[in-house]
Amino acid sequence: MQAAGEIDDDGFMDMVASSTPSVGYCNSMGTATTMNSLAEGLGMQLPGSAAIPAPYRERGQISYETGLRIVDMVHEDLRPDRIMTREAFENAIVINSAIGGSTNAPIHLNGIAKHLGVALNNDDWQKLGHKVPLLVNLQPAGEYLGEDYHRAGGVPAVIGELLAAGLLPHPDVLTANGKTIAENCQDCRSTNTDVIK
């Protein structure tokens, strides 16, 4: 727009400054939003935490709750290897397809799985994710921004929709809060079906 003469330098800077709420937050379904969503989908983040924009007060609240929960997890001996099982990774692959996640997701999740000794490869992504419908209408492929994703219900709403459709392969996997993914999300639905279908 600037190169075409449609806006001046000040207009360009205003557009850039308003395109994202702050540092530390990806307002599209890039690698950061994808991996936050998949960390929650794997069960390693508290429910509802992945899509909270960085400057929101909720981000500070969930950070505090996460710190408290980590202490409890130590006392409960709830280790990452008990949460990030093969079944949890299969769920994450399905969630990635539903959110329209970044093409970097297989590289990252396969690497995390390998580190944990969980067998996961690119064939799994094709087998598990190929028939899952795209539920999230988020830029760059869609219309909406990350804040809209959060307001529409974020990852719990996506998982709730997948559960309702019978598309989440392992609803009984354990998550960081000590509950199953189904217990956390079975009643969650999108509050804006333009953003999360």
Name what the model sees in each region:
Residues 1-197:
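Catalytic or ion-coupling anion/metal-binding cores of large enzyme and transporter domains
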